[in-house]
Regions:
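A conserved mid-protein helix/loop that constitutes part of the nucleotide-sugar donor-binding site
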Residues: 1-13, 33-36, 124
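Conserved active-site histidine-acidic residue motif and adjacent donor-binding/catalytic loop
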Residues: 50-62, 121
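Short hydrophobic beta-strand element within catalytic cores of glycosyltransferases
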Residues: 90-93, 97-104
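Conserved acidic donor-binding segment of nucleotide-sugar-dependent glycosyltransferases
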Residues: 105-123, 132-137
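Glycosyltransferase donor-sugar binding loop
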Residues: 22-36, 52
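A short, well-ordered alpha-helix in the C-terminal region of glycosyltransferases
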Residues: 132, 139-153, 163-166
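Nucleotide-activated donor-binding/catalytic signature segment of Leloir-type glycosyltransferases, i.e.
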Residues: 36-55
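Aromatic "clamp/platform" in nucleotide-sugar-dependent glycosyltransferases that forms part
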Residues: 73
Length: 180
């Protein structure tokens, strides 16, 4: 469940504190009513430097971005975070699903931090994390490299297939072939 309104409010706070910031909200409209509420909110807050892109070629568009933001209320393993990391872009996410693990790794992972994680629907925390991300190009580059390294190590197609095969073998050994 996406929470674009919190992102809009957080960006409004951020843009009142920092100059030359822009927010691009990527993707098509799944819920017309919610989209209309978001457009109305942008108009009500009189935000000028926010763009709703509609559907775009993510790979091409990623080159224009300094970092990405995911403000979901509920999530499993968000593909958008992995896409961001593949493009060497750090992320600001809400603490849902496996976002924290994607950003910080799991035990034994020494790739480093790849972004900031904030509680869902916490606009002040989100604005602060966005501001920290905006403040340092060097930090963004370092975090982007960390995310890309983590993605290459754990989420490449070949590795995923290998991990699933390993899991199936373990299940087969424990419960027999008929169970699979």
């Amino acid at each position: 469940i996406k929470d674009i309104k919190t992102m809009i409010y957080a960006f409004y706070e951020l843009s009142s504190r920092m100059e030359n910031v822009r927010l691009h909200i990527l993707g098509g409209v799944d819920d017309e009513e919610y989209a209309d509420e978001c457009y109305a909110l942008v108009k009500q807050l009189d935000i000028k430097n926010l763009v709703f892109t509609g559907r775009v070629d993510i790979v091409q568009y990623m080159r224009k971005l300094d970092f990405t933001i995911l403000t979901s209320i509920s999530e499993g393993q968000p593909l958008s975070v992995l896409e961001s990391f593949a493009a060497r872009r750090p992320c600001v996410t809400t603490d849902v699903g496996c976002c924290r693990e994607l950003l910080n790794g799991k035990e034994g992972d020494d790739f480093g931090c790849a972004g900031y994680c904030v509680p869902p629907m916490y606009r002040d925390g989100l604005a602060a994390a966005m501001e920290k991300m905006c403040e340092s190009r060097r930090r963004r580059i370092r975090m982007g490299k960390s995310g890309q390294a983590r993605t290459k190590a754990y989420y490449r197609h070949e590795r995923m297939i290998s991990e699933y095969r390993k899991l199936y073998r373990e299940v087969e050994e424990a419960y027999g072939r008929d169970w699979i």
